[in-house]
């Protein structure tokens, strides 16, 4: 069985030219699959039937693997079995038609107004702090995705009209407003940006002058959140979710929020209506004389 796995790794590395990260992920998943098969005396790939594939998923779930990781394991196994079909080792792919457990929709966590004020209450004039605050203010002000913030250039912002041009999913461009505080923070950052010796027109650059990567932006946000005493873990998703939730609470205009967020389908935006209803239900329970629950 290991012989075919080695052939597969060579195929991925040399013909498909997958990244080392992808290759390592596939190897990790297939190592776990091999362990399950060996523990159950399956010594040949021809013994792997649809029921065996389901058994692998069941055992993986039993060991505590989450839904997203289960989907990744099934994908890795399915692609390897497809390779065995190409090699003539199998006639059909036994993983075809088998689905991983569906991932449940989780309500996104958001940051309340008090926490946001605490987060952004920083008047440091250090260049890195000016940059980081500008990123936070802009992301929260316009509800940007991480990739949208990372891709901004100097020409993306119009300070006179306070509009920002972003490239969203599917290379769809949209124009968004940004607020007074974000405008001020970005302009303060631009005053010191040249100190970083920028190598191109990226709006946010690292200390080496390169466009900041998604990971470096995430890391800076984590550091900022800890430093500002935020109790919960800070990440770009939370700022975007906070923007969406508070916009919906203030306007109740689902279509407008959909446009601002750049969602193709209204159903994606509707998750925030559940958040909004949850908030309203809590207020109702606390305020309505006939709704208060006995303790």
Curated annotation (Swiss-Prot):
GO terms for biological process: cell division; chromosome segregation; DNA transposition. The keyword Cell division applies. InterPro entries: CB, DNA_brk_join_enz, Integrase-like_cat_sf, Integrase_catalytic, Integrase_recombinase_N, Integrase_SAM-like_N, Recomb_XerC, Tyrosine_recombinase_XerC/XerD. Keywords: Cell cycle, Cell division, Chromosome partition, Cytoplasm, DNA integration, DNA recombination, DNA-binding. The active site is at residues 145, 169, 237, 240, 263, 272. Pfam families: Phage_int_SAM_1, Phage_integrase. Its main location: cytoplasm. Transmembrane segments: none annotated. GO terms for cellular component: cytoplasm. Residues 106-285 form the Tyr recombinase domain. Residues 1-85 form the Core-binding (CB) domain. The keyword Acetylation does not apply. It is found in: Cytoplasm. GO terms for molecular function: DNA binding; tyrosine-based site-specific recombinase activity. It comes from the Bacteria. Belongs to the 'phage' integrase family. XerC subfamily. Site-specific tyrosine recombinase, which acts by catalyzing the cutting and rejoining of the recombining DNA molecules. The XerC-XerD complex is essential to convert dimers of the bacterial chromosome into monomers to permit their segregation at cell division. It also contributes to the segregational stability of plasmids. Forms a cyclic heterotetrameric complex composed of two molecules of XerC and two molecules of XerD. HAMAP family: Recomb_XerC_XerD. This is Tyrosine recombinase XerC. It comes from Mannheimia succiniciproducens (strain KCTC 0769BP / MBEL55E). The gene is xerC.
């Amino acid at each position: 069985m290991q012989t075919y796995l080695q052939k597969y790794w060579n195929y991925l590395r040399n013909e498909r030219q997958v990244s080392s990260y992808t290759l390592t992920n596939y190897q990790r998943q297939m190592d776990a699959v091999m362990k399950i098969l060996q523990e159950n005396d399956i010594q040949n790939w021809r013994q792997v039937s649809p029921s065996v594939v389901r058994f692998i998923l069941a055992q993986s779930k039993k060991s505590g693997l989450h839904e997203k990781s289960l989907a990744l394991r099934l994908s890795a196994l399915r692609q390897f079995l497809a390779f065995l079909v190409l090699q003539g080792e199998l006639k059909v792919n036994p993983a075809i038609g088998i689905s991983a457990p569906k991932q449940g929709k989780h309500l996104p966590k958001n940051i309340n107004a008090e926490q946001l004020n605490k987060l952004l209450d920083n008047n440091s004039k250090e260049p890195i702090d000016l940059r980081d605050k500008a990123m936070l203010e802009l992301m929260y002000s316009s509800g940007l995705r991480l990739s949208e913030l990372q891709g901004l250039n100097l020409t993306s912002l119009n300070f006179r009209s306070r509009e920002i041009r972003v490239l969203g999913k599917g290379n769809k461009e949209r124009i968004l407003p940004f607020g007074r505080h974000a405008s001020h923070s970005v302009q303060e950052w631009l005053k010191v940006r040249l100190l970083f010796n920028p190598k191109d027109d990226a709006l946010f650059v690292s200390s080496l002058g390169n466009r900041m990567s998604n990971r470096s932006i995430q890391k800076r946000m984590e550091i900022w959140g800890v430093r500002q005493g935020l109790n919960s873990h800070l990440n770009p998703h939370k700022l975007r979710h906070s923007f969406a939730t508070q916009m919906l609470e203030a306007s109740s205009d689902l279509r407008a929020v959909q446009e601002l967020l750049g969602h193709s389908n209204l159903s994606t935006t509707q998750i925030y209506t559940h958040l909004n209803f949850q908030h309203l239900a809590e207020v109702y329970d606390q305020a309505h004389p006939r709704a208060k629950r006995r303790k």
